[in-house]
């Protein structure tokens, strides 16, 4: 029997983000997922090592790695459309859930127990909350990159995403802002000069 899961996942590289905005550099959901996994890992480690919190770091990273799985079937719906009203948002959440269930069903039964739980994440878990913050951090960093390249198209998005991140009242996010975000405004020569 043939299983299509990884062939579908490999198509993440063809699905573009920020479709309604002019970008100086396109971003696909595969590279975005890698960014979110790295940032979620950082936030989980900060929670555990800096603040003494309890979190499953591996689960956080795996939730992040698979957090865009549904989009290989649905595409990336622009945020203003996704959150236009409760009805659209609820319908889209249901569509995402069904797409994730379908994707999990594309794995051999022997693998589903170890992979499906990360595709069908527990959205109420602390690990998933860190992933959602990392997802927004990734978007914020994209805004910084675009603004640094002279693209003012991302100014409003940067402002609203930054406000959202601070409104989460997550010490891990504030720590990341203080310790790491300033470096995203530096050139390669400035980074090497530190």
What are these regions (language model features)?
Residues 1-194:
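Alpha-helical, largely C-terminal catalytic domains
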């Amino acid at each position: 029997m043939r299983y299509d899961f990884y062939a579908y996942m490999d198509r993440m590289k063809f699905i573009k983000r920020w479709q309604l905005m002019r970008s100086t550099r396109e971003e696909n959901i595969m590279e975005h997922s890698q960014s979110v996994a790295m940032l979620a890992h950082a936030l989980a480690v900060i929670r555990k090592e800096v603040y003494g919190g309890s979190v499953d770091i591996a689960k956080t990273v795996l939730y992040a790695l698979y957090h865009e799985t549904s989009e290989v079937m649905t595409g990336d719906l622009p945020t203003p459309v996704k959150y236009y009203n409760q009805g659209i948002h609820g319908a889209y959440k249901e569509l995402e859930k069904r797409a994730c269930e379908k994707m999990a069903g594309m794995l051999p039964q022997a693998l589903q127990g170890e992979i499906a739980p990360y595709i069908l994440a527990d959205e109420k878990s602390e690990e998933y909350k860190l992933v959602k913050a990392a997802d927004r951090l990734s978007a914020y960093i994209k805004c910084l990159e675009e603004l640094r390249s002279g693209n003012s198209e991302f100014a409003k998005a940067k402002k609203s995403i930054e406000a959202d991140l601070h409104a989460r009242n997550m010490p891990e996010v504030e720590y990341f802002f203080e310790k790491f975000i300033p470096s995203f405004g530096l050139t390669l020569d400035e980074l090497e000069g530190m």
